[in-house]
């Protein structure tokens, strides 16, 4: 078995009693009924498609009820992350974000992109922002130049998004993302990436 198969085999099943008898769900499907989506692991195209599909499904179920996005991610693909971000902004329901563990790179951008006043971290979460990474490019000098220009445009776009959601000016964002900038939950709150640090569930 590969890692994905092992991980899937370890996902718990929940059995519910209904008028029609028993029904079993994997734990994530059961939580989806409560409008909870998990964004866990590397941000890549397949995972992004699943998150986008869940956001659209929950909007179709009830366009006026909040969706809760739990994030534990080291980041990943910028384009995949932006597809999730754009969908969060596009749909009608507010998307509340919660960092559990870590939200780094694109994970941090998605955390900050939650609905205003509804962005949270658990106390021992870590958040990290940085500029988009340019992998080991190969090819002609002209191709490398094209990709270098694209990465600069992406950097500007991501800085603008972070500035919009944090209230920090572009110059501050550009300086702070020039290298990896790590923050604990309180620092992330002070920076404007989140609104509150939660150590207990707020009832009601």
Curated annotation (Swiss-Prot):
It is an enzyme of class 3 (hydrolase). Cleaves peptides in various proteins in a process that requires ATP hydrolysis. Has a chymotrypsin-like activity. Plays a major role in the degradation of misfolded proteins. One of its GO terms (cellular component) is endopeptidase Clp complex. It is found in: Cytoplasm. Its EC number is 3.4.21.92. It holds the Pfam family CLP_protease. InterPro entries: ClpP (IPR001907), ClpP/crotonase-like_dom_sf (IPR029045), ClpP/TepA (IPR023562), ClpP_His_AS (IPR033135), ClpP_Ser_AS (IPR018215). Disulfide bonds: none annotated. Keywords: Cytoplasm, Hydrolase, Protease, Serine protease. The active site is at residues 105, 130. Fourteen ClpP subunits assemble into 2 heptameric rings which stack back to back to give a disk-like structure with a central cavity, resembling the structure of eukaryotic proteasomes. The lineage of its organism: Bacteria, Pseudomonadati, Pseudomonadota, Gammaproteobacteria, Oceanospirillales. One of its GO terms (molecular function) is ATPase binding. It catalyses: Hydrolysis of proteins to small peptides in the presence of ATP and magnesium. alpha-casein is the usual test substrate. In the absence of ATP, only oligopeptides shorter than five residues are hydrolyzed (such as succinyl-Leu-Tyr-|-NHMec, and Leu-Tyr-Leu-|-Tyr-Trp, in which cleavage of the -Tyr-|-Leu- and -Tyr-|-Trp bonds also occurs). Belongs to the peptidase S14 family. This is ATP-dependent Clp protease proteolytic subunit. GO terms for biological process: protein quality control for misfolded or incompletely synthesized proteins.
